[in-house]
Amino acid sequence: PGSEDVNLVTSIDQNQCEYKGEVKDKVKGYSDDFLGNSEESLIQLGKNAAVEKNGNTIIISQYRQYNGTQSALFKIYACR
């Protein structure tokens, strides 16, 4: 499956999901609001990493915005 099949969620069911790893991504380019293009780019990077690790679900954590750079840690899972 491609990255369009990866779900961004706020929590997972430990009984239904297997932890596949995590990845930290960052995007340069300041955005005044978290819902801007930079966030979309960041989420796309997380979804791409999930596909590489055979995952289909990601949780975003440790989101930071500093000096025009946004970064986040994505936890990757394969869920049934």
Regions found by a protein language model. Give the residues of each.
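Compositionally biased P/S/T/G-rich terminal and signal peptide-adjacent segments
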Residues: P1-K26
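Short glycine/serine/proline-enriched coil/turn segments at secondary-structure junctions
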Residues: N15, Y66-G68
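Short, well-ordered alpha-helical segments
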Residues: K20-Y66
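Amphipathic beta-strand/beta-sheet edge segments enriched in Tyr/Trp
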Residues: Q70-R80
